[in-house]
Amino acid sequence: MTRLLPGLLPAIVLLVPFGVAQPFRFPTANHSLYEKGGGEKFLVGTPGKPWTTGAFGCVRTDGWQMHEGLDIRCLQRDRQGEPIDPVMATADGTVAYVNRQPGLSNYGNYIILRHQVDGLEIYSLYAHLSQVGPGLAVGQRVKGGDTIGRMGRTSNTRQRITKDRAHVHLEYDLVINERFDEWHKRHAPGQRNDHGMWNGKNLLGIDPRWLYLAEAEHGARFNLLQFMRSQTELCRVMVRETRFPWLRRYGSLVQRNPVAEREGIAGYEVSLNFNGVPFNLIPRAASEMKSG
């Protein structure tokens, strides 16, 4: 996928009519991503750093730290300068998780919604909220555009989010393992996990910016499954297992292989993007798997 700064978007993206129905909306009224040179108005960076440190990718600590979302800048404030932007569901879905105890996570108050789009399960996460919508509960259905909370500055990090950096942290994630809590107890004994399978360590993010730009470019022809399958490949791994959680949850990412169908599946060849997201899985027969 070609990497372009928001200020250098192709004209086709900038001219897309906003009335076209698309699966994913922005979580706030800030749509500056689509403006020429709008990156600085759309994202807020870390203290003393440019706005690009609020983007997705290895943008923190001089490129050594991964940031798995977008920090979308505040547009509305009260008389005390606190953010009051309504935060909205980006697509139709179901509430998967709500955390109303900001001291338990560096996400602060956060919400996770589950979406089914084009045959793929994907999750949106909204963090640092000052308020979660009253009555919002796990299992509740929401529509894209419904207000689910209010932008804030909540977090449990040592360095607090200042008023000038107020933002909503947005992620689009895939879940690694529904038994994450069991794994965590075995591999991190003594360490707390207050959020079960909704711990951020169990979520693999895709870049929301490129999702929105792909939507703008393709309009009604945008397809989330095709978007996922077109991720840039960093590497491939051979998995000598035929049953693992990713297969059950993301079977739509499995590519047919006549040889494995005929001889039997011995494992999977898995393509990973730069954030380690498995976006293409090819079943392999024993005759196709190299020994090593």
Predicted feature descriptions by range:
Residues 1-4:
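Positively charged n-region of N-terminal signal peptides that target proteins for export
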Residues 7-17:
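Bacterial N-terminal signal peptides
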Residues 20-109, 194-292:
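Surface-exposed, glycine-biased beta-strand/turn segments
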Residues 69-73, 87, 127-129, 148-151, ...:
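Long, contiguous hydrophobic alpha-helical segments, chiefly transmembrane helices and signal peptides
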Residues 74-76, 100, 115-117, 128-130, ...:
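A mature extracytoplasmic/lumenal domain signature
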Residues 76, 99, 133, 146, ...:
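Sec/Tat-exported extracytoplasmic proteins
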Residues 82-84, 90-135, 161-167:
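Zn2+-dependent peptidoglycan hydrolase active-site motif and core
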Residues 105-106, 110-114, 140-218:
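Conserved, short, structured surface segments that act as functional micro-motifs
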